Amino acid sequence: MKTGTIVKVSGPLVVAEGMRDANMFDVVRVSDKHLIGEIIEMHGDKASIQVYEETSGLGPGEEVVSLGMPMSVELGPGLISTIYDGIQRPLEKMYDISGTNITKGVEVSSLDRTTKWEFKPKKSVGDKVVAGDIIGGVQETAVVECKIMVPYGVKGTIKEIYSGEFTVEDTVCVITDEKGNDIPVTMMQKWPVRKERPYREKKTPDSLLVTGQRVIDTFFPITKGGVAAIPGPFGSGKTVTQHQLAKWADADIVVYIGCGERGNEMTDVLLEFPELKDPRTGESLMQRTVLIANTSDMPVAAREASIYTGITIAEYFRDMGYSVALMADSTSRWAEALREMSGRLEEMPGEEGYPAYLGSRLAQFYERAGKVNCLGMDEREGTLTAIGAVSPPGGDTSEPVSQATLRIVKVFWGLDASLAYKRHFPAINWLTSYSLYQEKVDVWADKNVNDNFSAQRAQAMKLLQVESELQEIVQLVGVDSLSDGDRLILEVTRSIREDFLHQNSFHEVDTYTSLHKQYRMMGLILKFYKSAQDAIKQNVTINDIIKLSVLEKIGRAKYVEEGDIDAAYDSIEDEIDNELADLIKKRGAEEL
């Protein structure tokens, strides 16, 4: 262990001398309180340390000890449904030790050392294995099997493998490597958080991550293994959108990072998720979720660690072959922590005081997402989808964090304050948002949902763009100056906005919409548009069309339960035909 002495304390930054033998990113223990820190800069024998706990009471002359290893997380059975702080300390255990206010220097194992897990081997003695091969599994929850993998850098033949109940530190397998050395394998691995976990090959993401949110799945989709940003001003619904994605996305594992946001938002997750049922498995959502809470009142430096901790845990499950979704709320708070540390290190500031390396740090985080061929001899694919909220002051997306994020991500869900104030949620602006995965998803949706899915989406998007042009004319000269055809477009796009894009996250049916239901809903609106166009050509007036009772039924169609969709929607389609046919007959009789 390398020992030094504190010479300066500046908030979360501590400078210690006598640290010549230490390394960059080594974990250190600061003072006799054993505060956790990490070396982030070296000058000769002086080390600058960012401390992940409250530094009040520290002073020059106190001891600093380098542990000689980087900041790492423990990976193994016991991660699912646990809530951690930013440096992977389980908050429930910390509460048992120190109560509601976390005391300094608390040391708690990330994974419980006493819990015994039922290990079932999947390999036999004499089998040849390489790094990443699955040697066995532990049924951690009803929906997640924690697959035990050969650690990175290990290759050889299985000499012994056991079955039964073990703790995470017990040896479950012994592998003889090519030099004849026996290597014991436990169910737990340690991995440095700043280092990307290896894989065999990165692939192009091409299948849709179904979120159940209509504006996302139909108009601005994200793939499994994609990256997305949700920028928006305060109160526009970033956190609720993140919660909706965490609840209903068809990922196998969800890692939710609350980075510098309100504590109440993490409380909502803890209260809601155990009560909600996953639409695919019927089990509690908590049984597939890992939570990392680093709320706004916790030490600023730990915000940076929380992002890396979360994505390393997500990569671990990706390596098992799972589809993982990671929510980071919010990356702006992480960037603010970088700015604070950069200022205390007296580095040259970049734009708006953020450090010059802001863009590269964001890229390092988002580039760890993707679809990969995992390590190991068997062919298995894993995906890691990263969705980051951005909180630009005043909703101004020209600020550095938003701009650096938009250069990296391929999906932009721009939240709009004016929509939020109109109570239109999700408040995703359909004119400014975009998805660069659209072409890949169109191919996937046409194959897996309906071969007309992408054509319907394109037609609806075109109508919404035409509406924005017509709105300018309406504001100048009024709606009566428009032709019946243009007024029909305004009526149909109102239906798309209010009946399709608007979604109530607190309604038990409307909160989640399957792809089939989304296709049928949009089909209803576009069928009405086509049939009404034909009626207008036969001299039916727009005033008669907008009084039809079927419009209300189209509006209420989103509350039809999944099992009744086809029968209910077929009935509404018949009503559209019948009511418009009656209008045409009536108009024909009047003309006679």
UniProtKB/Swiss-Prot annotation:
InterPro entries: AAA+_ATPase, ATP-synt_VA_C, ATP-synth_a_Xtn, ATP_synth_asu-like_sf, ATPase_a/bsu_AS, ATPase_F1/V1/A1_a/bsu_N, ATPase_F1/V1/A1_a/bsu_N_sf, ATPase_F1/V1/A1_a/bsu_nucl-bd. One of its GO terms (molecular function) is ATP hydrolysis activity. This is V-type ATP synthase alpha chain. ATP binds at G232, P233, F234, G235, S236, G237, K238, T239. Pfam families: ATP-synt_ab, ATP-synt_ab_N, ATP-synt_ab_Xtn, ATP-synt_VA_C. The keyword Transmembrane helix does not apply. Its EC number is 7.1.2.2. Produces ATP from ADP in the presence of a proton gradient across the membrane. The V-type alpha chain is a catalytic subunit. PANTHER family: H(+)-TRANSPORTING TWO-SECTOR ATPASE, V-TYPE PROTON ATPASE CATALYTIC SUBUNIT A. Belongs to the ATPase alpha/beta chains family. Keywords: ATP synthesis, ATP-binding, Hydrogen ion transport, Ion transport, Nucleotide-binding, Translocase, Transport. PROSITE patterns: ATPASE_ALPHA_BETA. The keyword Kinase does not apply. CDD domains: ATP-synt_V_A-type_alpha_C, ATP-synt_V_A-type_alpha_N, V_A-ATPase_A.
